[in-house]
C-alpha cells in the first residue's frame, strides 16, 4: 500500500529549472534551420556558423593516423598529455613572453569547455562578470549556468566595437569578479591593441579581486600586426586566464580540443571539475594537437590570407548598400553590420522592427542565413560568416543587395537618408 505512486494532477516536468531558463544557441538554431530548408530543396547560402571551410593541414592528419597505429587508445591524464602541455608552455613563452608551468595548462573538449570550466570553478552565485559587447553568443549562457550575473558594456560601430577604459571602470562594483572578452572578437572582428589593453590593465590594477578571462581562439586569424594579450601588461599575468584551442587556426573544429592557461589555483580547480564531467579529452586529438603546435604554420597563414581576401571582397560587395554600417574587421571571419535603419521598413505587412526579423527577411527573401545581433548583445546588428568560397560570398551579397533594393521599392522609407 505504501509503495503506491502518488497521484499527480499535472504531467511530470523532468527538465530542471536550470535548463528550462537557458536559451538555445541562436547560431546553432539558425544553422539547423538553414540545413532543414536545404534538405527541402531550397538553395540556402549559410553564413550563420563560424567554421573554417578548409581541410585540417596534412601533417596534423598524419599525426592522428600515426597515433592510431601507435595505439594511443587509453585514458590520458585529465589535464592532457605532459608533452602537449609543455608545448603550450613553450608557445606562451615564445609568443607572449609569459612563463608558466605545465600544471597551469588544461586541455578540454573544445575552448567552449575550457571557458565553462573556468567560470564554474571561479564564480559564486551573485558574482558579476563584465562582458564587453558584442560578445560571443555562449558567454551569457555560461554565466547563467554558473549562477552569476552578466554586466553588459555596450559599444557601437562608431567606436569600432570597443569599450573605453572609462566605461570599464564605471561598470565595476564590489560584486565584480571577472572580466570576459575575446580578441580578435567574435562577432565583430575587433582586435584589441597593446595600448588599449594597457588602458584596461591600468583600471584593473586598482581592483585586484577581478580575474581576467581572455578568449584568444582567433589568435591566428588576424589581419594586421602581432597578437597581443592581457598577460603582457604589467601586473596582469598572475590574474589572467588565456583560453585558446585548435578549431579556428588549424581548421580542427570537429576534433574538439581547446585549452586554458590559468593561475595555478584556477587550473587546479578546473582539473578537479573536469575530472567529474568529461575526464580527459580524446587521445588521438591530443597527438594531432601536438603536431599542430610544434609544426609549420604555412597552412594557417594561407587560411588567414584567404580570410583577409574574403573580408575585402565582402566589404567591397556591400559598399554603398543603403542602411548597412559595417566597420572593417581586423580579425576573425565575420562581418557585423549595424542594420537598424531598416527596422522601420515594412515587410509582410508590418515593420521589420528588430534584427531577428531582419535575419528572417534575409532567409526568406534572399535565401541567406545570418544571425541576429541580439545573441551577441548588439540588437541593432546581424552577423555574417565569411568562412565560405569567394563565389558564395559574391552570390550571398548580391542576394542581400537585391532583397534590400526590392524592399526599398515597396516602401516609402528613404533608407539612403
Can you describe what each PLM-predicted range is?
Residues 75-108:
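Conserved N-terminal alpha-helix of the aminotransferase class I/II PLP-enzyme fold
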Residues 48-51, 66-84:
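A glycine-/small-polar-enriched, mobile loop at the entrance of the PLP active site in fold-type I
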Residues 1-15, 19-25, 30-33, 37-44, ...:
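PLP-dependent class I/II
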Amino acid at each position: 500500500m505504501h509503495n503506491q505512486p502518488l497521484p499527480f494532477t499535472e504531467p511530470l516536468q523532468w527538465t530542471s529549472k536550470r535548463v528550462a531558463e537557458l536559451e538555445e544557441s541562436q547560431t546553432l538554431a539558425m544553422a539547423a534551420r538553414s540545413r532543414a530548408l536545404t534538405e527541402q530543396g531550397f538553395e540556402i547560402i549559410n553564413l550563420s556558423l563560424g567554421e573554417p571551410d578548409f581541410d585540417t593541414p596534412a601533417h596534423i592528419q598524419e599525426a592522428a593516423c600515426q597515433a592510431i597505429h601507435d595505439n594511443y587508445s587509453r585514458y590520458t591524464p585529465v589535464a592532457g598529455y605532459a608533452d602537449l602541455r609543455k608545448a603550450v608552455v613553450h608557445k606562451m613563452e615564445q609568443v607572449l613572453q609569459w612563463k608558466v608551468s605545465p600544471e597551469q595548462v588544461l586541455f578540454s573538449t573544445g575552448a567552449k569547455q575550457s571557458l565553462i570550466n573556468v567560470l564554474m570553478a571561479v564564480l559564486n552565485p551573485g558574482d558579476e562578470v563584465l562582458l564587453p559587447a558584442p560578445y560571443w553568443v555562449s558567454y551569457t549562457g555560461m554565466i547563467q549556468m554558473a549562477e552569476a550575473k552578466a554586466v553588459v558594456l555596450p559599444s557601437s560601430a562608431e567606436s569600432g566595437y570597443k569599450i573605453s577604459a572609462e566605461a570599464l571602470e564605471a561598470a565595476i562594483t564590489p560584486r565584480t569578479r571577472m572580466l570576459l572578452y575575446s580578441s580578435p572578437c567574435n562577432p565583430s572582428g575587433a582586435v584589441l591593441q597593446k595600448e588599449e589593453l594597457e588602458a584596461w590593465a591600468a583600471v584593473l590594477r586598482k581592483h585586484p579581486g577581478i580575474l581576467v578571462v581572455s578568449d584568444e581562439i582567433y589568435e591566428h586569424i588576424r589581419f594586421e600586426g602581432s597578437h597581443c594579450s592581457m598577460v603582457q601588461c604589467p601586473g596582469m599575468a598572475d590574474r589572467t586566464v588565456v583560453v585558446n584551442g585548435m578549431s579556428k587556426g588549424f581548421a580542427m573544429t570537429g576534433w574538439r580540443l581547446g585549452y586554458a592557461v590559468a593561475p595555478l589555483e584556477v587550473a587546479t580547480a578546473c582539473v578537479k571539475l573536469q575530472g567529474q564531467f568529461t575526464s580527459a579529452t580524446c587521445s588521438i586529438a591530443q597527438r594531432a594537437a601536438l603536431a599542430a603546435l610544434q609544426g609549420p604554420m604555412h597552412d594557417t597563414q594561407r587560411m588567414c590570407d584567404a580570410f583577409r581576401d574574403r573580408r575585402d571582397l565582402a566589404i567591397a560587395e556591400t559598399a554603398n548598400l543603403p542602411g548597412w554600417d559595417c566597420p572593417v574587421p581586423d580579425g576573425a571571419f565575420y562581418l557585423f553590420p549595424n542594420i537598424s535603419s531598416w527596422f522601420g521598413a515594412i515587410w509582410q505587412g508590418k515593420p521589420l522592427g528588430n534584427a531577428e526579423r531582419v535575419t528572417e527577411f534575409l532567409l526568406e527573401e534572399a535565401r541567406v542565413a545570418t544571425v541576429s545581433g541580439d545573441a551577441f548583445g548588439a540588437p541593432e546588428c546581424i552577423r555574417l560568416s565569411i568562412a565560405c568560397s569567394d563565389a558564395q560570398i559574391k552570390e550571398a551579397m548580391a542576394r542581400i543587395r537585391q532583397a534590400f533594393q526590392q524592399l526599398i521599392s515597396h516602401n516609402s522609407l528613404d533608407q539612403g537618408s
